[in-house]
Amino acid sequence: MNVQAITSKVVSTLGNKESLIPIILKDGVDSTSLTVKSYKEGGIVEGKDRAIDEFGTQAIWVGGIPFFKKLIDYTAYKKAKLNPGVDIRIIADKEYSKWAKDNAQGIMSNSKTQTVKQAITDCLVDGGKKAKNLYKGKVIAATALTLATYFLLTKGKQKNTKDSVIKNMNEEIKKPTFKGNHSTPAIFKDFENTEKNTTPKKPSFKGLAKSVSEAILFNPVHNMQIIDAGITSERLACSRNKTELAEHAIKEGSFLFFLYGFGGLIEKGINKLADKKFNKPIDLSIDVLMDDTFAKALDKGTVIKDVDKASGCKTPTDKLNFIKNNPDNIFVQAAKKSKIVSTVKHKGKDVVDTSKFIDMKDFDALGENLKNLSNKLAQSKETTKKFLNKTKGLKVASVMANIGISCLFLGYLIPKAVYKYRKMKTGTTKFHVEQDIRNGKK
């Protein structure tokens, strides 16, 4: 794999709004920096407490949903004889599902023998009711089980921290000292009573089904937002004192804002700057910008013509037929490069995978972006190669800037804000929960 291919892969992944990789990267920076800061400012006990919470949460957060979904795929779906690889959005749309079934070709990507046509046909039995209900149950169950797993982690972490503090206190008492008059630590005076206050209220998952919308069901990033909201709620509910509650509010609120909101604002701002100041639109996927076929089409001036060929499509079905029947059209090729259209092998050729949903809003937006880039090239006095090289450079810079700015806030400013608040509130950056345990408050 050459440098261009590696660059394309990295930038494409980090700049993909549907990908979990950039979210995992930002969360990793956040978790690592907070853990290091906890060891430095709060001490060993808090460092361990934070490490279990942050990295344990990340493992559950990233692995929980996929694990439980796979478990349901291998159990409930297998029993129902339905292929989980068929996009449920297709089954939910009668017109789309008919087109998908009638135009299906090739073998399902998650099967060695089952055809795309058979997989779709199976899911359409009983009008797709069985498939839709099974899918909804799968997402709800996977989400609830993931949140329940985090709840168990939280209880285990808090017990581990308390046990560690008590162990340290016992060792301190056993150490010989020249000072007499040892007083019994408060925690041992009324140990049973403190236990009553350490058990957080068990979170309720009632009504979860009602709160899950289609956007959450069908989008892995939105699904993660529900997980984050649940984890944030549990962290706040299980806070061991008011200071920890406020710290969680600062940390979690900032994390969710930068993770899901600020990244999009940065991207829009950089894209607008590139278009206005440098006359280089960078809305297109890096995979499209680095494609030689696309570069040749730009050079020949055929991009706008190819996009306009789809303008005669009156209905979504017309557009679907256009995509299927025009594999050499640069607009269609760009849609495949942008992951808007999925493909599957059939008789040695890449054909449209009709089991995967094609979002027409994304397809139409791609057409506008292709025309915009082509028009900007025509207005410039640069060669196609020079124009594209500058555009690709700006695209790479925009993605890296987005990730970099978010990591700066999550990895430096937010941890600093948390401990600044703690010092302002308690007069020290030391672990207040440890002190509460020593004083018998927890």
Regions found by a protein language model. Give the residues of each.
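Glycine-rich, hydrophobic membrane-spanning regions of integral membrane proteins that mediate transport
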Residues: M1-K442
